[in-house]
Structure formats: structure tokens, C-alpha cells
Amino acid sequence: MTEESEETVLYIEHRYVCSECNQLYGSLEEVLMHQNSHVPQQHFELVGVADPGVTVATDTASGTGLYQTLVQESQYQCLECGQLLMSPSQLLEHQELHLKMMAPQEAVPAEPPPKAPPLSSSTIHYECVDCKALFASQELWLNHRQTHLRATPTKAPAPVVLGSPVVLGPPVGQARVAVEHSYRKAEEGGEGATVPSAAATTTEVVTEVELLLYKCSECSQLFQLPADFLEHQATHFPAPVPESQEPALQQEVQASSPAEVPVSQPDPLPASDHSYELRNGEAIGRDRRGRRARRNNSGEAGGAATQELFCSACDQLFLSPHQLQQHLRSHREGVFKCPLCSRVFPSPSSLDQHLGDHSSESHFLCVDCGLAFGTEALLLAHRRAHTPNPLHSCPCGKTFVNLTKFLYHRRTHGVGGVPLPTTPVPPEEPVIGFPEPAPAETGEPEAPEPPVSEETSAGPAAPGTYRCLLCSREFGKALQLTRHQRFVHRLERRHKCSICGKMFKKKSHVRNHLRTHTGERPFPCPDCSKPFNSPANLARHRLTHTGERPYRCGDCGKAFTQSSTLRQHRLVHAQHFPYRCQECGVRFHRPYRLLMHRYHHTGEYPYKCRECPRSFLLRRLLEVHQLVVHAGRQPHRCPSCGAAFPSSLRLREHRCAAAAAQAPRRFECGTCGKKVGSAARLQAHEAAHAAAGPGEVLAKEPPAPRAPRATRAPVASPAALGGTATASPAPARRRGLECSECKKLFSTETSLQVHRRIHTGERPYPCPDCGKAFRQSTHLKDHRRLHTGERPFACEVCGKAFAISMRLAEHRRIHTGERPYSCPDCGKSYRSFSNLWKHRKTHQQQHQAAVRQQLAEAEAAVGLAVMETAVEALPLVEAIEIYPLAEAEGVQISG
């Protein structure tokens, strides 16, 4: 009978994706059990299992009943065919099926095939390979198969004795998965196939059921275990075998019998099909350990050893002539190398298939965010990220669609999934002399961590169960508890880089890390063609093209492209600075900022110049120093005016008038309509609106700053001039940051800090040329242009250049005729504030003379008036005290 490959129809909506192999699963239990395959597990062997109530097949060659079975969590495995079942009742029903298949059947006339029942997404259907009929149970399918066997008298049915069990890998499809299992028979009469004799036909027919999950992309061969799949793929590439594995391979080849030849390969099936294969003939196991055990039990090791198959070009050992021929073809035809990731392939078709992965050909687009996916299942899993109720939510506020990412994130929290405190974790490799982070000064005693014990759990564990002390979950076996604690509550760095020895949590992290050693960047950006070494870095880079910032601060509304940047930003709002300098007491919320700060105390910077004794804090400053001072080059040039600068920082500080005139002012304030040239200026302008309050409007021109108290123009009060003092309402104070000295308000913390230097006299920015100090760094930059002779601000009308932008603004008023500064006394206007200040000094002198004259007249008239003046010459009379005797003369008293 020829073999007909049947496709498996899936009715499951996959919701869970494995982060290691990107395989999809439909339930939580499946993905948890599958992820155990990526973790080193302990295997147990059940030797000599015998149950009088169950018919167990024995090995006819050795007469022994030794079976090896892998113990799975909460599963029951049939010792005859290796199938995994979910409950004891299902195991009993399954074993009854084997008993019915082994019972002899009487010849009954063939019946017409029954009508196939309708498909259902909640049951498992069994399909007949002859008439394509579907059945809802194994009993119906078995009875129907007997009708086909009775209709063919030339091939009478014979009792079936199942071969030795196959050690299955991690289960992918369970008994309750809504999948149609399609059965198929291997081709009979193939090359090397054992043809049973007439006597053997009436006694035994050895049948084996295998679950094939892994498909080779080169030759479409199917495999059951990942170890066999990887071993097979190594035969397609010319790679030497390590010395440690060569004796084991030679022993396995010698133990094999020359009569054992692989059966012809079946028709290739899609890699995603969960299909079973029935083979007639000698049972051929896919697992090397099971195959070696069966050979030892059957006595095949004593047979004649097969000839060792070595490659004459690279001395590589192979298990079969077919594998050797495939390997020799790679030597004859050569290999094909990928130009993007340097992988080699034995054929052009496999290379083209691999290049399709780099081209990111995705046909399923998300209508919300525009991301593309290769399969519809991935798109459906992504679409849940846009729904208001994600599948997995963490108490810290994060939500996840992928279960694996949620489990990895949950391990970053403390015991029981409680979020850790916001104190940043110090680096893994401590810096020499680096202090420990100081505890937060909150004024409250730090609560001790409660001890984890059985008394703090929900209650005593039930007899015969094992309880987890961290989450109070109970298990029936100690092995399950151990695996639960290792997989859920502890994140071990089990994967090591073979080059630098660094440990990682996942294999994918190791693969991405290895590209840092090799320099590979196989993931180019489709927008700017910039390559990256991992898909995560590419996805993070693409946010710069789309402008998307998914992580937003709930306090100030500022958005970020990475969650780590948002966490660091939240420390600013929390005023939590755990890293404190031991010398000056300054605190920082990042450890590297404290490390940089400590260099200022020592005076020795880490990067020293080899040609001169100067040292620098940053490497780029050292490179600029060597390039400019020792090499005499100025590589950074302004594209508008052609001015050359030694560093990119100087070029950014260079305010080119030509570029400023050409640059459009695209940022407009939504409150007053003012346009500015950058987003930073717009943000500062809107902050000024917020500090002013909702009812006030900012002036187009900044108001003239108030004169210092010592030089303020003395305006005679009505009381001093003999008039009547009228109470004027105090102006409403605007909201903002207030100076504790003069009660002046500011919109930003930076402006307040700069203003406080006026009261403290601090000038932290000295000029390295003349030693003059300034309160602001911008004042120092403007001052240094006097030494360098640089005049970057040129007038576009007459071409006159200035070193300070304020001087250019004053000069432009000559051409425009604008005079924005007017005197409040006489109404005369001026182009600059300095000219107005000089003019107001004339009014101050007139006011001072008038006040002195009035005081002299009052003193002469009364004779008892005493004028108190300050020690310093003040422009305004601050106090005029007139003794009570002056009231009789009708003089107004002010005090």
C-alpha cells in the first residue's frame, strides 16, 4: 500500500510564544512544560516495569522487559507506544485499544464506510487513510479499519505486538489539544526494508508509533528529538568532530548491525504538523540512547562491526553512507556563504530561504501600529497588546501579552512577586573605592524583611504533598517542587559565552552577545540602512524614525523610548538619591555620576595625554585635545559660514547668523502664538506660562529688570512730600519657585539656582585666560570670545559682527528704528536698556536734590526734625522720623 501524507488541521488559537524557539502554544500548561526542555532536567528510568493487568510487549531477541521512560509532570505514558495521556482513566482506555488490536478477528463481509461526522474544534478526530472518513473516537476508527482489513484477503490481519517504547521529548501536543491526528504508513518494499516471511506474517508484525516534530530545512527529513535534529544538521556542513565525541560515535557504529539499513524517507510534511507515522518492519528509534539500549538488550553488539565511514577530506565520522554522500557533496560543490551573517549553506536554495529571513518579508500587518509579522498567529498575539485588558499584568503596573516575557519579568521582583523598592541595584562588578549606596533618608525606620517559613504560609501542607515556601503552592512530587522553584522563583545565569566567559539568562542573549565579538550586524534598518546586531536594538532604533515614545512619566508627562530610562527619570521625582559623596555630601541617583564627581576631588582624571601632562575626564575630550593641540587640526566646520572648530561641542555652541536667518521658526506656543526655533525653547516658554498662572499673559518683550536697591531711583512718597498716603492693593503673587532672600519668583529650578548666586556671591565659572569668574556658563562663553576674537553674530544688513547675540539685537534696532525702552518719568525712548539706565540717572539726581531741599525746608520750619540717613549713600531716603512735637505745627508724620 502506498503512503499518503495527510495534513494536520489545527483549530487552536495560539496565545503563548516560547522566547527560545518562537514556537506557538495554545494553553498555559503546554508552554510551561515546553520551556522545561530549555532547562537542564533530571531524567529517571523505570527498569523492569511489569503489570499483570496490562499486556506488555517483550523484545523477541533478548527476552527481556527493560523499558526506559521519561517521567513527565502530571502525565501518564503508555509503556507500549510511548503516548502521553493526561489522566489514569485515559491511560486505561488507551491500553484497552492495544488489547483490541491484538485480539484475532473473524472474517466478516466488508461494510460500506460510515459517513464522516462533522468536524468539531473541541474533539480529536481520527481519519482513515483509505477512504478519508473521520471518527470521533478510537473505537469507531478501529472498527472501521477492520472492515478494510477484511476486504483484502491477500493481506490478512495479524496480531500486532508493539515494539519497545520510544523515549519522547518534551510534549508539544497533549491529549486534549483540538488537533486532527493523521496516521500514515511507511512505504513497503523500500530499499533495505525487511520483508516478513509467511510464518512471520501470521505471528508478529512489529509496529512503532513516532511523533515527528523537527524538520530539516536542507533535506526535509523529520526528527523527533532536538538532539537528533541538531546532529543531523551537522552532517550538511564540513565541520570537524570534537575528540571527546569521536570514541562514542565509533562505539555506536561498531555496535550497529550491517543488516540495519534506514528505511526510505517518507514524504516530507510541514514542520508544524503534529502527525504520527506507522512503520511496518523493524522498530527504528529516533533517540540515540534508546537505540543503544535496544541494541545492547537484543545482543546486536556481538555481531560483526560495520565499516567506519570517514570523510577523506576532513576525517569526519558518519553513521550511514547516505550522510557521508551528502557531506562529500559539500566538498565537491562548495558551500554558499550568507553576505549578511556569514553563515554557510550547502545549496543555493537553502541560502535563498535563509536570505528571506533577513529581508523580513512579512505579509500580516497590524492596522493600529503598522508592525508586520510573518504568520497570522503572531499577528493575533500582537493584536492583544492594543486591547484594554492584556493577558498578563504585574503588580508593578506593567502588562504583557507573551507569557514567557511575563515570567522573566516577574523574577525581577522580590519574594512572591512583590515589586522591589525603587533603590537602584548597584553594578555587578564593584568599582575599586566605590562607596555603597546610602539608605534613603525618609525619617521612617526601615521595615525588616519577614522571614520565609512554613508558619507564614497559608497553613500546614497536606500529607504526601510538597509546598513551596515562597508562593505556598503544593505539588505531589519533590521533583515538581524543585523544578518549580528553579523555573519560577529563581533566574539563573546558566548560559556562558565561550569567548569572554560572561553568563546570561537566555540562549538568545548569548547569540546576540557573540555578535559583539565577531562584529556581525545582520539586521539593517529598512529606513536608513544602519545595521544592528539584534532585533531588539533594531526595534529600539526604529522608534527614532517613527517618533514613538511608549514609556511616559505619570508625573510630568515626559516620554521615553526605553523603560530603563523612565525608571531612572522617576528617581528625580521621588527625590531619591542613594549615592552620596563622602567628602562633600553631594548626592546622586546614578552610580556613574558619583564616580565622575569623585574625580573632581582627587584632581586626577582617568584619561591622560601621552605627550603632555594634561588629563581628561572623558575619552572624547582626550581625543579632541590630541587632535587640536598636538595635531593642529580643526575638523568641525560650520556648513553655513565656514568657521572651523576643534570639537563638535564648539560647533553646536556656534550660533551662525546665516543659519539662524534661514532656519524657520516652526515651534508655536499654543497659548500666546509665539514662535520659537527649537523644541527646548518652546518647552521653556510653556513652563513660563505655567508659572505665570492661567489668567496672566506673558509680554512679548522681557520686562526691564529692576535696579538693585542701592541704585534704585528715589521716588518721593506722598507722605514725604506732605501729601496723604493712600493704601494700594498688593499685586497678586504668581505661582512658582520663590527665592528665600528676596521673595522673587522663578519658573524653573535652574533659574532659581542661578539667581541664588547673586546673594551668595558664588561665581563657579572662571576664565582660564584672565581668571575672571562668572555666575553662568553662558556668560563665560561670551567672555571667552573676547580672547579668541570670534564674532559669530553678524548683521545681515551691514555685515557688522558681534561677539554677543544681545549686542546684535541692539544693533538691529538701528536699522529698524525700534526704541522699546521708554522712561516712565519723561517718556523718552531708547534702543537699549543700558542707554535707558544711563538716562534714568539724571532723573535720580533731580529727585535726590528735590528731596534734600524739602527736608531742609521742613527741618528749618519745625526745628525738631531729625533726618536719619544710612551709613552708605542711598539714593532713596528710607526713614524720616519726625518727633511728636511737630504735630502741633501741622507736619504729616510718616513712619
Swiss-Prot record:
Residues recorded with modification Phosphoserine: S164, S298, S717, S728
Any one GO cellular component localisation term in the record: nucleus
UniProt xrefs under SUPFAM superfamilies: beta-beta-alpha zinc fingers (SSF57667)
Compositional bias annotation for Polar residues: 247-257
ZnF region ranges: C2H2-type: 16-38, 76-98, 126-148, 214-236, 309-331, 336-358, 364-386, 392-413, 466-489, 495-517, 523-545, 551-573, 579-601, 607-630, 636-659, 667-689, 737-759, 765-787, 793-815, 821-843
Family: Belongs to the krueppel C2H2-type zinc-finger protein family.
Amino acid composition bias (Low complexity), ranges on this chain: 707-731
Metal-binding recorded as keyword: yes
High-level lineage: Eukaryota, Metazoa, Chordata, Craniata, Vertebrata
Function: May be involved in transcriptional regulation.
Name the record gives this protein: Zinc finger protein 574
Compositionally biased region (Basic and acidic residues): 274-287
Protein localization: Nucleus
Segments for region (Disordered): 239-301, 434-460, 687-732
Keywords: DNA-binding, Metal-binding, Methylation, Nucleus, Phosphoprotein, Repeat, Transcription, Transcription regulation, Zinc, Zinc-finger
GO molecular function, one term: zinc ion binding
Organism for this UniProt entry: Pongo abelii
InterPro entries for the chain: C2H2-ZF_domain-containing, Znf_C2H2_sf, Znf_C2H2_type
Phosphothreonine, modified sites: T724
Pfam families in alphabetical order: zf-C2H2 (PF00096), zf-C2H2_6 (PF13912), zf-met (PF12874)
